[in-house]
Amino acid sequence: MFSSLYPLARASLFKMDAEDAHHLTLRMLGAAGRTGLACALSPRVPDAPRTVMGLSFRNPVGLAAGLDKDGAAIDGFAALGFGFIEVGTVTPRAQPGNPRPRLFRLPEADAIINRMGFNNSGVDQFVKNVQAARYRGVLGLNIGKNADTPIERAADDYLYCLERVYPFASYVTINISSPNTKNLRQLQGAGELDALLAALKDKQRRLADLHGKLVPLALKIAPDLDDEQVKEIAATLLRHDIEGVIATNTTLSREAVKGLPHADEAGGLSGRPVFDASNAVIRKLRAELGDAVPIIGVGGIFSGEDARAKLAAGAALVQLYTGFIYRGPALVAECVKAIARG
């Protein structure tokens, strides 16, 4: 029923300010998840099991981080048929993010520009929300650094968050690719990334001993990388035995949206315009990584065929964000069914 009603709901939501609509949707999904209403109204999504990073996924179509930064609507999103849920990005301390307005729709391009800036309630509240959720499927927890933490001390924030979220995560995503936190993408540089992953891997081993379980780490990277940068990142992932990589985050490019309203707004562009760039990075990663490190493909998925294209490029799993906002819950089932057909 959600699927059939969504076009009407979207028409109303798209008349609202984009961020206000986002918060309203989160509140509604949070309430629906708590009451069980979401399950009653949700589309039937077939199982299409996958095992990736040593984890068992009900199906290979997940929710990308960013839609639920505080983990406040996990049960509501889970009821929509996603095979896994990723929430965050969370930082050690609560922060407001960048000034509003900071979220813009580009409906002519099926795109969104955001410069949210890791707005979140902090890792302590985040963990409380995660613990309160009833969902027991695969849950990814996405971590970042506070805006006022010097880039030279970024590892401290990631290590702190990793320790706090580790007991509650199926996997942990290291987000170093948001364009909306000053200098964050510097951490994708060879030396910076090597040092960060070495520290995180050491922390992961110690936490695994403490908690009696190894929680996989996944690195989320940008689409705005040249071939040499992708090769360096792949080599660093292999060197440190990182369990997964998510490709990709939003792009700074505006080539595909030139002349459209809001196209010149600062921030990361997501949606259809990032589809090809994301697929190109996935193909390059697969060529460098082989089967050693699984790839989660995200960026511009608006149909089942788009999801299949991500897998054909080399992804093992996919995630939805902007396509989900434009298409609604029906997109989840469509993608799962298309992938299951092979």
UniProtKB/Swiss-Prot annotation:
EC number: 1.3.5.2
Stretches assigned to coiled coil: none
Active site per database record: 178 (nucleophile)
UniProt KW Lipid metabolism keyword: no
Residues at which substrate binds: 69, 114-118, 175, 180, 249-250
Required co-factors: FMN
Membrane topology, from the record: Peripheral membrane protein
PANTHER family hit by this protein: DIHYDROOROTATE DEHYDROGENASE (QUINONE), MITOCHONDRIAL, DIHYDROOROTATE DEHYDROGENASE (QUINONE), MITOCHONDRIAL-RELATED
NCBIfam families membership: PRK05286.1-1 (NF003644), PRK05286.1-2 (NF003645), PRK05286.1-4 (NF003646), PRK05286.2-5 (NF003652), pyrD_sub2 (TIGR01036)
HAMAP family: DHO_dh_type2 (MF_00225)
Name of the molecule in the record: Dihydroorotate dehydrogenase (quinone)
Encoding gene (name): pyrD
